[in-house]
């Protein structure tokens, strides 16, 4: 009998179709519905050790159109505002209900590269029964001003350092997610491999600016008439 069952980085799943870390994996209920609909795995919404900076507003996503056709989306969404304790609970629930499906977590530091924070979170999820780790080294909204997110992905030594911290705390697959807007993404991937990465995820959204409605000069997306630095996804960046 034909089957789509596959193995990725040593993890078995019903098929090779896996939801990326994004709004569709914001909570365990949404992930469960995706599994019921046929998806083989999911990377949970990026989470951070410290939630001080995680406050999303609405609306934060806008469609980029050419004529009436949608070619992409811009957004200024941050990581998950839920605490690690809630994600641990959700991850356990998902693996109990869907033991055959792949569940990866996506980790992001907040303020400063604090070794023990990365190690502690890795140990907690390793013991929660998940299948693997994505290391978000590519988020433009991931505290880049404090040296995080895409700033890590642009620095080979930082990639090696953080990947090694996580690698030393787990035998599960470790998958750094690298940004496209770096001088040499190949050398960044090599740095991750040398630190023990099992796979590489590429790419994240690309830096952009919010659009402007030229008829009323309102930016989009807009909250109370204001917008912010954005990123773009979809067909427009291919």
Regions found by a protein language model. Give the residues of each.
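Alpha/beta enzyme core
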Residues: 32-37, 41, 96-97, 110-238
